Each structure stands twice: as structure tokens, then as C-alpha cells.
């Protein structure tokens, strides 16, 4: 099999012929048809994010066709078309069985291994690590079976490849994490892949208004197509003032889909619900006023 391998942050990826071991229990082999290019991979490739084992095959969102299944896999068979998600869960640990699968003890997407901590890819007998359990920058990959979500065989796999990260993160933030009710107001800061899907999620639950905020006005046409009722160009207008002019009191839910601390600190919301996208937010939250969580009753939560 071939894969684009990152040997060292800051260096170009190199296409290599790798050995791929057979799937173990609860694992499947997927022939990759399409891969998304996530900003998380860029952060890893350029060294902005550190601590990853090398060499590594990047790619945390993709779609393909199941080629082989390991023991105990019941919901998949060869020939199935699947979306690959970077956040599979084991379904067996304490957190999974108590309804908190986002804390799954075996899910370690940035540690480079599968659920047992080992890899299935190797080069000259040395391990090559899997990014986000998926490693979609490869012609084939072994992934946890729960990472592969079956879809209709007539769905375009190039389109489906995007669902495993930005769509599930953005829509899931609205429906599952924040549980935005119909009629609630919401603002989305950052109208990229995840922000657009927050907007789409808001439209699905009939939130109103849905305010898109970005410094690039060229993104607003598509934001409106997905459900934004208003758009604020933050390069021209103060978004806090603009949002308060539109809502009188600020929004009920503010979704921060861009990793800029000043955006979070603007506090352009009413009741303090601030779900954060899947970026390292610890430093950002540390920069908030110390009384923000207590005095204002704020809730800072990652989207996925």
C-alpha cells in the first residue's frame, strides 16, 4: 500500500510503500477513495501541534470501501461503503456504558495507535503511526470497526469524506453538545467547514436568528444557503455590537469555530453557552477573566 508519510514536522510529506498488517479483533481494512484535508493535519504537519509520534500517516476524515473485517465485527462486511470518523468509541469502557462516550478510555486519536495502542502500518519493520485512528492519506488503512460508519452505496464518496470531521463536529455541536432548542438565537464565529455545519445544525433545529460572523465576506453567500439569517463582517463591524443590535440582548448560544482567544473573550452571548470546536482550547480558556465561569455562569465545552 502507498501512503503520504510525515517523518518530521515542518518537512514535506513523502509517499512511501508501507506494509499493512491484517485487522485484529474489532478492526476493518478500508480501501480509501477520498480524504478530507483537515486544519488539524496542517497544525500537526507544520509543528504547531506537538507531541505526536513519528513517522505518521495524517488524515482524520475519509471515505472508502471495506475490504476485510476482523473477528467480532458484526455491522460491516466487505464491499460496504463507509465514512471514517476520527473519534470512534469502544462501547465497552466505564464511560461508554454510562453514556459519556466522548470520554472513552480507549479513544486516543492523537497518540498514533489503534485501541490496543499498536499500529498496523510499518516501514522496514518499524511502526508507522495512524493519525486520528484513520490515517486517510493512504491507499488502504486498518481502523477500529466503530470508526467506520456504513452509508448507502450510491452516495458520492468524495462528498461523504467530509462528514467524518467537519459535519459531525459542527452539526453535532448544535444538536448534541449544546442541544439548541427551536427558536433560540445563536451566533457562529468563523464560517469555515465546522462553522458552516454549526449553521446547518441551527437550521435543522429551527434556531432563529442564526448569525454568521467572519472577516471574509466571501463566505457569507454559502452561509446563507445553509441557514444563516444574518451575516456580520467582523473586519468592518464590531461583532458584539452588531449582534446586540440584531438581538437586543445577545445570543443564547455562541459557537466559536476559530481558535482566536479574543473571539471567545468578546462574550457576545446571553446565557454563557460557548461550545468550542475541536482545537486546543485550554490556553484560550485560561486567558478568559477568572470570574467568567463563576460570576457569569459560563460553560466552555469542546464540540467533539
Predicted regions and their residues:
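Short Gly/Pro-enriched turn/cap motifs at secondary-structure boundaries
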Residues: 19-20, 53-59, 128-133, 139-140
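C-terminal hydrophobic helical "lid"/dimerization subdomain
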Residues: 265-304
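Mid-domain Rossmann-like dinucleotide-binding core that forms the NAD(H)/NADP(H) cofactor-binding site
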Residues: 139, 146-148, 152-237, 241-242, ...
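A short acidic, Gly/Pro-enriched loop at the edge of an enzyme's catalytic core
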Residues: 242-252
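Cysteine-cluster motifs in flexible loop/terminal segments that predominantly coordinate metals
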Residues: 86-146
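Glycine-rich beta-strand-centered segment in the early N-terminal region that forms part
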Residues: 21-35, 48-97, 102, 110, ...
